[in-house]
């Protein structure tokens, strides 16, 4: 009898050991639709509507359907680019604040059915949906609750109109993965000819609970976005950045779309009652809609990569906008930029050094929750600790010394977001040295660290709302971002050269010859007061690869110049900062150069702010030796400056001058002349 009972007892104990209970969830937790959405991480926005043709960001509502007339519209081009960029879906502006709609809605005449496009028979939402389906992309719909065209906006009747249109969008086009409600609402507008200001109670007017219920009924799997959710929230800025500390938890009952002090809620709250994760939205240009004058302002690769790491790498999804142009195409420069970003992301995460490494935890919960699950590429398996064991660590042994600069960690957020503090260390001669530390992790956290050599690293989980529940740990060595260095000079003549990454070496030249690796290394700012051409390259010492060269042609430094004006802000016209500008009430700029120069021309940079004003269209340049007697030495126009507001270089016959005055004879919009930056040409 004993011989029978003993094996049975062992079998029972073994069975019990395998049945380790999972940890209790830490509320709130995501819904199934939120989990599916979180896995997308990266998708695109398409801003294309009446604003594209009125050249506005926010239309007033008085536009005419006849204005909407793209000449080469190709939604398949949009979908192809998004797919090649690695995006998982696209969201389109079905209706923006101006009220014009991109489908033949039976509830309004302010739509594509009364435009010349496709002879009034087109349905842009249908073309968009078909293109997305062809390329395997999920479909999202942006719908602005505010309508500056509709005569009933601000009245109960408008809410019926809004819900009728949502019903059209959510029943006629198949599965929708995200419905995007803008937080801007209420203000001046055309409103069917009333041409007035209408204010609404942003909390109660739209009857959001009923509207949300409608969306749930028609599209059960769709995420709803607004400032406050209910499924996904605005990150609180339009820069594409989440935060060092970003919680997916939100005090959902205290937040509503359009609330005035939303910024204090943007990072989420540790004690939030609802699971409403962040979505980081940003345009690939300054504006959301296409403007030809922004063709030179497409975000650079370093800017886009910073956005990637500060959004997806900080517990947020990333929504990048394409301002489709008047042809109906994503502009070539936008396509080039987004595909370069896609290639760089792929390069950065090409090899997971942790895949072949061994993992050992200071403790674990038992079978099914051990450290070897941390590199199995399966989000649904995870390592965790016994109940009450808040602090723990995981060692990663690569088996040999490796170089890395990225640490990726994912929490199994299906059981709630937990980690409040963690650190990364490397082993050096038997002791541990801290490399970096962080706060929240969430669905994904990516630490960007300096190039580090180590055979063993340790991740310490220091504090949390509950025991750590970690799904994946990845370690990567991202190649250096080899981009032309940024060369700048202060008015005092101090030149600085900055590479895209701090680990890169920089070499430069000022003699007109091309810079060469190993020759004339940049070690700090240096002085250049006279005209000079400075060129620079960035070099990755590990690979020997170099960036394309950067080049800047400087003329006289401006440290001794004086702007003759009673307006103290006039100095902004010569402060060597492209982001600043000065508005001249007298439509001119007068400068004392501090010495007589042999003037051979001048440069004028229009203001580079997002909303331009006062670009000089026609100019006159005058010179003087005493500041009293003036002579006009040239007069002309800055051709196409409205659409291409880049620095203008104007050469003149040589003239002696100590004082110069640039006069605006006409601006592009009739407003007072603005000066982004003024310079002289003396060589």
What are these regions (language model features)?
Residues 333, 340, 344, 348-351, ...:
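Aromatic, loop-rich ligand-recognition surfaces of beta-strand-rich domains
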Residues 7, 477-588, 598:
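Short, compositionally stereotyped local motifs that mark structural "simplifiers"
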Residues 19-390, 395-396, 408-410, 417, ...:
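Mature catalytic domains of secreted/periplasmic carbohydrate-active enzymes
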Residues 91-94, 547, 624:
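Ser/Thr-glycine-rich phosphate-binding loops at phosphate-binding pockets of nucleotides
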Residues 14-15:
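C-terminal motif of bacterial Sec signal peptides marking the signal peptidase cleavage site
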Residues 1-4, 82:
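Positively charged n-region of N-terminal signal peptides that target proteins for export
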Residues 436-440, 514-522, 639-641:
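Short beta-strand segments within Ig-like beta-sandwich modules, predominantly Fibronectin type-III
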């Amino acid at each position: 009898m004993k011989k029978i009972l003993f094996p049975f007892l062992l079998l029972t104990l073994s069975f019990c050991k395998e049945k380790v209970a999972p940890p209790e969830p830490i509320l709130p937790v995501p819904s199934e639709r939120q989990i599916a959405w979180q896995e997308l991480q990266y998708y695109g926005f398409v801003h294309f509507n009446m604003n594209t043709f009125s050249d506005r960001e926010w239309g007033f509502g008085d536009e005419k359907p006849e204005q909407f007339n793209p000449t080469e519209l190709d939604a398949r081009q949009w979908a192809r680019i998004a797919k090649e960029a690695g995006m998982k879906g696209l969201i389109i502006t079905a209706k923006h604040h101006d009220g014009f709609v991109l489908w033949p809605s039976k509830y309004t005449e302010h739509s594509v059915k009364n435009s010349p496009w496709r002879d009034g028979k087109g349905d842009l939402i249908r073309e968009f949906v078909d293109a997305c389906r062809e390329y395997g992309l999920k479909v999202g719909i942006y719908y602005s609750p505010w309508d500056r065209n509709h005569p009933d906006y601000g009245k109960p009747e408008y809410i019926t109109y809004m819900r009728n249109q949502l019903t059209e969008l959510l029943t006629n086009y198949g599965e929708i993965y995200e419905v995007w409600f803008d937080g801007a609402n209420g203000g001046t507008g055309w409103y069917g000819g009333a041409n007035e200001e209408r204010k609404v109670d942003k909390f109660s007017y739209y009857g959001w609970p009923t509207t949300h219920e409608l969306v749930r009924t028609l599209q059960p799997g769709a995420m709803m976005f607004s400032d406050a959710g209910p499924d996904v929230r605005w990150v609180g800025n339009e820069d594409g950045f989440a935060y060092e500390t970003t919680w997916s938890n939100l005090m959902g009952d205290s937040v509503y779309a359009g609330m005035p002090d939303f910024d204090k809620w943007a990072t989420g709250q540790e004690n939030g009652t609802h699971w409403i994760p962040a979505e980081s939205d940003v345009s690939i240009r300054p504006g959301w809609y296409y403007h030809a004058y922004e063709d030179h302002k497409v975000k650079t690769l370093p800017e886009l990569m910073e956005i990637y790491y500060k959004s997806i790498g900080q517990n947020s999804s990333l929504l990048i906008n394409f301002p489709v142009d008047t042809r109906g195409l994503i502009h070539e420069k936008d396509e080039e930029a987004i595909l370069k970003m896609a290639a760089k992301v792929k390069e950065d995460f090409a090899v997971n050094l942790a895949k072949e490494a061994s993992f050992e935890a200071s403790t674990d919960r038992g079978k099914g929750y051990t450290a070897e699950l941390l590199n199995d590429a399966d989000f649904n398996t995870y390592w965790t600790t016994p109940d009450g064991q808040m602090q723990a660590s995981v060692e990663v042994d690569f088996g040999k010394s490796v170089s890395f600069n990225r640490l990726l960690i994912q929490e199994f957020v299906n059981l709630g977001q937990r980690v409040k503090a963690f650190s990364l260390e490397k082993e050096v001669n038997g002791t541990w040295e801290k490399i970096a530390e962080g706060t929240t992790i969430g669905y994904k956290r990516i630490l960007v660290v300096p190039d580090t050599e180590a055979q063993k690293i340790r991740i310490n989980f220091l504090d949390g709302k509950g025991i750590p529940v970690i799904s994946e740990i990845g370690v990567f060595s991202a190649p250096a971002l080899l981009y032309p260095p940024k060369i700048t000079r202060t008015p005092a003549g101090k030149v600085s050269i900055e590479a895209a990454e701090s680990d890169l070496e920089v070499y430069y030249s000022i003699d007109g010859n091309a810079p060469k690796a190993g020759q004339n290394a940049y070690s700090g700012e240096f002085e250049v007061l006279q005209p000079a051409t400075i060129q620079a390259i960035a070099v990755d010492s590990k690979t020997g690869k170099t960036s394309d060269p950067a080049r800047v042609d400087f003329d006289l430094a401006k440290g001794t110049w004086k702007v003759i004006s009673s307006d103290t802000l006039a100095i902004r016209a010569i402060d060597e900062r492209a982001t600043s500008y000065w508005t001249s009430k007298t439509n001119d700029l007068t400068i004392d150069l501090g010495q007589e120069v042999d003037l051979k021309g001048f440069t004028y940079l229009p203001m580079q702010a997002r909303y331009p004003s006062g670009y000089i269209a026609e100019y006159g340049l005058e010179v003087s030796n005493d500041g009293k007697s003036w002579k006009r030495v040239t007069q002309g126009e800055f051709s196409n400056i409205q659409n291409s507001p880049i620095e203008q270089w104007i050469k003149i016959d040589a003239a002696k001058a100590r004082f110069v005055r640039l006069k605006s004879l006409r601006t592009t919009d009739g407003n007072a002349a603005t000066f982004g930056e003024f310079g002289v040409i003396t060589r």
